[in-house]
Amino acid sequence: MDLLPREKDKLLIFTAALLAERRLNRGLKLNYPEAMAYISMEIIEGARDGKSVAEMMDYGRTLLTRDQVMDGIAELIPDVQVEATFVDGTKLVTVHNPII
């Protein structure tokens, strides 16, 4: 299977997000790459489901709390930027202060 670099990146994000989701379900706190992947994948999937950029920006701030990530991780992630494919094309979604 030949994949473009962008497609490989999305698969890597998806794999890391799946691992993060499983760890959250077990009550474990997420580290930096897990938190980034989890938020990114939720935004990518929401765009795929037909939601708007504004909806994804708001939704991205509701996904994780400080209690769900390791100490100091919330401060390391002031914003998350994700390129997602929406109904009307690919757009950059920026979520400011994603971990509340």
Swiss-Prot record:
Keyword annotations: Cytoplasm, Hydrolase
GO molecular function: nickel cation binding; urease activity
Superkingdom classification of source: Bacteria
UniProt-listed Pfam families: Urease_gamma
CDD domains reported in the protein's UniProt record: Urease_gamma
Gene Ontology cellular-component annotations: cytoplasm
Known partners and oligomeric status: Heterotrimer of UreA (gamma), UreB (beta) and UreC (alpha) subunits. Three heterotrimers associate to form the active enzyme.
The EC number(s) this enzyme carries: 3.5.1.5
Protein name: Urease subunit gamma
The keyword Metal-binding is annotated on this UniProt entry: no
Reactions the enzyme catalyzes: urea + 2 H2O + H(+) = hydrogencarbonate + 2 NH4(+)
SUPFAM superfamilies listed in its UniProt record: Urease, gamma-subunit
InterPro entries: Urease_gamma, Urease_gamma/gamma-beta_su, Urease_gamma_sf, Urease_subunit
Subcellular location: Cytoplasm
Pathway participation: Nitrogen metabolism; urea degradation; CO(2) and NH(3) from urea (urease route): step 1/1
Keyword Cytoplasm appears in the UniProt entry: yes
Location (main, coarse): cytoplasm
Family: Belongs to the urease gamma subunit family.
BP GO annotations: urea catabolic process
